[in-house]
């Protein structure tokens, strides 16, 4: 047994140094827990930060936007507006469709929100139109969130109506049942139906009207209870042939008698099997298709949901005929997995680089093995805590672990370097371990808790940004804590067992060359430091200039919100003149699709035309462009978008808006471009007055591009102006007029065909092929009081007017949304400021309000809290350091190093052409924690030298700087190389990781150079200040 010298207690490490078996088993337990935890961690793109969002869709075919607003949307909004926890309510009412999107507070569970929405719908039921084909349908889904998976179903042998029927009953319902799926939509609108197209001339010739025919059809097709017979011995169920199932049966239906002869429906109408809505269509790579979009519930695990769908797809497709082909066009999890894989590779690369730096400095394999064990052990142990906290393996947590490689090795390096110093002086390894670990224990604790203090403000950030970075901050803090434990337990124990004077003194040619190089560097640093200490005011001027420069750079640097990612999917909106019909839009989309599919970066394309819950008007079309994998194309998504827009620009009458899909979705509606700004008024008239003025002003701003609005008030409308007196004299009511028009032109759903598996509709309309346009109104006839028929023209005048194609509300008031992008050379901060300046110039009245939406609103909130976040981090670190040092002065000395980190980070971002977004801001906050460790290591040793060796402050800080130069350089390079893979990242998701790496590498490079000279000067300045205060106020004693 080795005899320990007096005072070699080892501090908190003593027990672990003297009990190597127990220490090894404890570390093995941490390792095992981490490995098991990793297997249970889900994989995601980002932490789950979705707002609880519910979409309520009501379809009322044939209703105008004005009718949808007043009869459907408004009653629902009044009930929804009374719900507690509602953050925002937006609605869009267009021809035949009402979509209300409800976004709740982050703290409200989605299931609770669902219950409140259902109760509100029930309360509004009595106020809704009685002839709604279906009640309002709600889905736990954010409409702005892109589908997690898109499938195209095509067939060369079967009509799309049959294909959709099979897909809906055999595939879509099964996928809807998968845990995590919020909504499955079938774009294409080819739901089977029996279509009855009335021949207006034949109907009029027989003295009939569309209303009498509708009544006849409705009465001829019923499916209701008929009762049963219960005799003394047997019970008999009653049934009848009260249902008609096919177009042929409807064609033979007798609707009236003329002179004793039956008039069948086929005599006055074309009856055929068709689609429920003939103004809907979808195409996959220009082929007619049923496009199935699968959206997840807010908060659901996207990887697990997609995996479940993939597993059941083979079984589901086997139930379809061989002529029906199901193709997965896009799967967002493919890019998510690739991004996570790239980040994992960068994590492993960072570990390798850090270990290489350790070997370069220590030049000793046993000494390198020790931190080489400590780093992965600390990182793997973190997984166990992540499982307990319900975290996931995502880009942010992996970024935290990558950055942590530079942090966690610091503690091990400091311990090893200190113990090695005593062994080289001739101490026995065990004694050196006890003495070195005991001496450095307080420093390790100071480094750990001061670094965690920097992360504390991140945990208290509000709203979605706080939720987003909570996993990042906690993961990093846990890794740092485990690292401190490992460095105070396993590291000194391994040093006592693996290091010796022989191993440390054993050198080869490379080691000797490195040693001579480090000796020359330290000697040069010593000479430079001596000169700096002899000219303190010059150094202080440099430090003060650094502070001013950091403030100036903060002001001028372009500011953004969240990096734009290349996920390989582009969402698009195709816009045409407001009077465009379905047929013209279908033709335009074919032209656009042909141009898009010619691009070498495009892998597949889906397009959709028509009005449904997602597409508001007939003059717009939705597109989803799926790009080839990143390694299979030459350009990033923004270059592809520019190329596609240039290719389509020559097609007359269309405007194409494209934006890349993002993992972080804050918006509540699908927008044409990336950013939104709303203009709201109390009336539509006030809104119509200010929309063109503001739009013209915004379009003139160089900081904005592709400015557009969803305000569409130039749609063509036929106004039927009924002479109520004439109508009353003939016994015709307004309800008769509405019914006649609805029967003719509303694709009215008049009856339901019930089968064992599904329900199908009977659609009534006029055959307008021979009388297109307004001339079709002249064929409308109504039944008068005496039983005769009267043409509509006898009681009404037809006027052509302009009318809105859609009416949008935000929190129950009319609103229009301006969408815009930011051109190259400008930042989101520039665009936001330009819009605010324009708003002031226009001098909007008090009843007109404006507001940024989605990511732009989040950017404003984040920008406003950024300075306070950094101040809070500095204050938290000052409090922790003040408690640890029992001093008001020394924490200020340590914190004086922070401006150097800010200057380096901001300069690096500007040189790299990167914006100061929230990812880069997190990097700057982390730099606050990293850079101050240099000062801590210097000041700890200087105070110890003053206290234990009686040195003067100047000699103490000079010696501390030289003694700690090597570990400072080592730990800084380790942190720098830990961030370097992020800065040089080029794979999937690199846009997210690169700003963090740039900020940290730049900050570390500049701060490493400056703090080695400014810290000792500021230390001596505050020491003299402390002596001055004590001399002036002798009763005031401050322990420094």
UniProtKB/Swiss-Prot annotation:
Localization in the cell: Cell inner membrane
Signal peptide limits: none
GO molecular function, one term: xenobiotic transmembrane transporter activity
Membrane-spanning segments: 25-45, 347-367, 369-389, 396-416, 440-460, 472-492, 537-557, 863-883, 888-908, 910-930, 968-988, 998-1018
One cellular-component annotation, GO: plasma membrane
Pfam families, per database record: ACR_tran
Alphabetical keyword list: Cell inner membrane, Cell membrane, Membrane, Transmembrane, Transmembrane helix, Transport
Bilayer topology annotation: Multi-pass membrane protein
Ligase is among the record's keywords: no
Record note on quaternary structure: Part of a tripartite efflux system composed of MdtA, MdtB and MdtC. MdtB forms a heteromultimer with MdtC.
NCBIfam families per record: PRK10503.1 (NF007798), RND_permease_2 (NF033617)
Family according to the record: Belongs to the resistance-nodulation-cell division (RND) (TC 2.A.6) family. MdtB subfamily.
Protein name: Multidrug resistance protein MdtB
Source organism (scientific name): Salmonella newport (strain SL254)
